[in-house]
């Protein structure tokens, strides 16, 4: 069982330690008016807080820290029982004793992103200026904003250089942003099932989900919290539509085919006759119990805005010019949300910038979500990459 472990650091005050119970099972770092978060939209967010989890212990020279960046609907509960759902952590396949990210060797950190809804400041938080829930008054945030906030947390923890930054999907975008914005602070980077910019198709899928949320009569232009209601129907539809993109035709056929749900014949109604219908309805209904609808709008928009070459004249290689970080880029053959062609474009740009990079395309029919599932080849690649990076840094055997 992986435990949640805090660290002793003079940068974290006793008063802040007293606030660790602000959110179930999470540590919370508070940043006051003297430490505003500058956002890309031109607004300084202050005050704000970041909810996070840690696993393992930071070694004496603070060289074994790994930051995990979560995906769109993830959170900081990587390898512990989720306080809302009661389910195992979302990446227990990768994080744990004997696994590629082993807390006995590494100090592992995962923070709920700014704009999220599991303890970090977001649209579901209280606006200190009004005493009410932010709602749509919350400023629009970007992937660089998320990473900027994470860097402030890493500073607070007294860590100069991260041994590795790891993430898939939206988490992979954060990994790339970390290496572009703070290249001297990232020794190695594992970017999984992601892209350097969101495609037109993916923006379209996100707009579909946002429109489903906003069409729900209970949304009230984002002001549902003040009315004590939630746009669960719209958010459930958004989740159902998005979840399809995380799968593959082959996986859906293998798992469900055209099999009926608890019946032999069609009902000639609009009930969930097919197993795949029942599965999607479950995905939608379970999601709304743990996620905020406005956060969904904000985080999908942040992904849409992501274009790491945008500040470099559209030349991707310039974003990584002179970088010393070791990269491992991973894609999956059946991922049509972030296809391998996008990972190859990233690898070509890294090669053009003379970065040290390895690339793996893994054969699987499990779609985009393969990085969250039991795919042994992926685990082997992640383990080998981290062990190689650890050996190069003289880290192996010195964790904890």
From Swiss-Prot:
Pathway: Amino-acid biosynthesis; L-methionine biosynthesis via de novo pathway; O-acetyl-L-homoserine from L-homoserine: step 1/1
Enzyme category, top tier: transferase
Active site: 169, 335, 368
GO term, biological process aspect, one: methionine biosynthetic process
Binding annotation for substrate: 239, 369
EC number, UniProt record: 2.3.1.31
Family per similarity comment: Belongs to the AB hydrolase superfamily. MetX family.
NCBIfam families membership: homoserO_Ac_trn, PRK00175.1
Protein purpose: Transfers an acetyl group from acetyl-CoA to L-homoserine, forming acetyl-L-homoserine.
Quaternary structure note: Homodimer.
Official protein name in the record: Homoserine O-acetyltransferase
Organism: Bradyrhizobium diazoefficiens (strain JCM 10833 / BCRC 13528 / IAM 13628 / NBRC 14792 / USDA 110)
Encoding gene, per UniProt annotation: metXA
């Amino acid at each position: 069982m992986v435990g949640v472990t805090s660290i002793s650091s003079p940068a974290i005050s006793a008063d802040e330690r007293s606030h660790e119970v602000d959110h179930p099972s999470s540590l919370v770092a508070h940043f006051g008016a003297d430490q505003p978060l500058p956002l890309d939209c031109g607004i300084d967010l202050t005050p704000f807080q970041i909810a996070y989890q840690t696993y393992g212990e930071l070694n004496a020279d603070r060289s074994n820290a790994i930051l995990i960046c979560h995906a769109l609907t993830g959170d900081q509960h990587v390898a512990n029982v989720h306080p809302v759902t009661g389910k195992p952590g979302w990446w227990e396949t990768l994080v744990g004793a004997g696994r590629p990210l082993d807390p006995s060797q590494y100090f592992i950190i995962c923070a709920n992103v700014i704009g999220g809804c599991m303890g970090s400041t977001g649209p579901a938080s209280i606006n200190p200026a009004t005493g009410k829930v932010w709602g749509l008054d919350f400023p629009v945030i970007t992937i660089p904003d998320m990473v900027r906030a994470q860097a402030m947390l890493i500073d607070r923890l007294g860590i100069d250089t991260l041994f590795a930054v790891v993430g898939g999907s939206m988490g992979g975008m954060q990994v790339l942003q970390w290496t572009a914005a703070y290249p001297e602070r990232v020794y190695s980077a594992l970017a999984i099932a992601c892209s350097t910019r969101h495609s037109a198709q993916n923006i379209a899928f996100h707009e579909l989900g946002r429109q489903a949320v906003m069409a729900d009569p209970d949304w009230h232009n984002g002001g549902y919290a003040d009315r004590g209601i939630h746009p669960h129907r719209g958010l459930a539809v958004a989740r159902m539509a998005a979840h399809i993109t995380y799968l593959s035709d082959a996986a859906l056929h293998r798992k469900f085919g055209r099999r009926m749900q608890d019946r032999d014949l069609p009902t000639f109604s609009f009930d969930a006759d097919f197993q795949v219908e029942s599965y999607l309805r479950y995905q939608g209904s379970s999601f709304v119990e743990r996620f905020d609808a406005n956060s969904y709008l904000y985080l999908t928009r942040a992904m849409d805005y992501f274009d790491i070459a945008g500040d470099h004249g559209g030349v991707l290689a310039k974003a990584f010019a002179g970088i010393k970080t070791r990269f491992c880029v991973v894609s999956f053959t059946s991922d049509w949300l972030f296809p391998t062609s996008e990972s190859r474009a990233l690898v070509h740009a890294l090669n053009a910038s003379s970065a040290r990079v390895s690339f793996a395309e893994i054969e699987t029919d499990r779609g985009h979500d393969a990085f969250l599932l039991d795919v042994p080849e992926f685990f082997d690649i992640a383990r080998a990459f981290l062990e190689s990076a650890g050996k190069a840094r003289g880290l192996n055997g010195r964790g904890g």
